[in-house]
Amino acid sequence: KNYWAHVDSSAYSRQMQYYYDTFGFSKIGSVYGDEIVCAIPDYTSVAEENGFTIVGYKLEREAFADEDEYYNRLESIYRRMVREDGVDAYILNTDVIPSVEKAAELMKIFYDANIPVVAQVGSAYVKGGAAMMIVDPRDAVGTGPFVSNIIGSVFNGSVPEDLEQEYVSSPFLTLNLDVADEIGYKPSFEMLIACEKIICSE
């Protein structure tokens, strides 16, 4: 009873739901190393509820002898997604491509086919042109006051286990307009208003 932890069990479900509501895709591609880290169960649940398909490939970097071999395999999967699987969106999952520059290079495969790429985590991917959009499920601006209120309650005598643990973050949306323009995507006025950050070269 002396422990407390912040939880947000539906963060990635809400994220995928937002992406689906925005793009209305029928098949979204996903390459992942670890199902739990990449929130595959959460995403799959949303897919089943909404009737779209996740075209998933499991690929562990540690299984490859060198980086070049890994990225060559990754590139071949991406090309297969576009040419054979018929994906109409792609989600860039956690830790699949640590380098933003490399991610931007490989995501051109999707952009050349006018397929939007969204990110699971890391607004740097949006800033670097690797992803068009991210709805960050972790809102530090909102979570901070929530946690500080909990700490204050504990200092004032409350028992940690009796305090609220779940905080549902507001979506933190970052959009790259240059990428959107490249693939011919026109964001709505409502989306632009909802953005916390808009990346644009002009």
Where does each model-flagged region fall?
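Short beta-strand elements at the ligand-binding edges of bilobed clamshell
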Residues: K1-Y18, G129-P145
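Periplasmic-binding protein-like
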Residues: G29-Y32, M81-S99, V118-Q120
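Hinge/cleft segment of the Venus flytrap/periplasmic-binding protein
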Residues: S153-E202
